[in-house]
Amino acid sequence: MLHNLIAEFLSTGLMILFGVGVHCDEVLTNTKYHGSGHIFAITTWAFGISVCLYIFGGVCMNPARVLAQCALGMLPWTSFIPYVVAEFLGALVGALICFVMYKDHFTESEGNVNPIAIRNIFSTNPNCRNLPRNFFVETIATTIFLS
């Protein structure tokens, strides 16, 4: 079990390092790929996820996948909380590493870049706040992700 938890921690951290890193590069001032666009970002995310799956094998890297695997009997329910904690901590460490790597760019971007764009490096929110529809969209996206 410890081996699996370490794999979840490292794979999730590496995935977030790719994903948050590309958004830092795309959004923050004076980065090499500033303004490179959405296609660059999603391609880097896809590459990062693929690399993590190749290196670490059958990892989940997402609590929704852990929940689905527990529900399908592929993982015991006793693994749910430890896996989610390992993934959460891995994501936190990956985001923290990105913040430290791009700290000078964050400082330089203050006042020059929309604060919402900077916040969206680490999180997202709906442009149109309609909670039932937002929930529906996330449900469909998660279902597609799980299949």
What do these predicted regions represent?
Residues M1-S147:
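Membrane-interface helix-loop junctions and terminal tails of multi-pass membrane proteins
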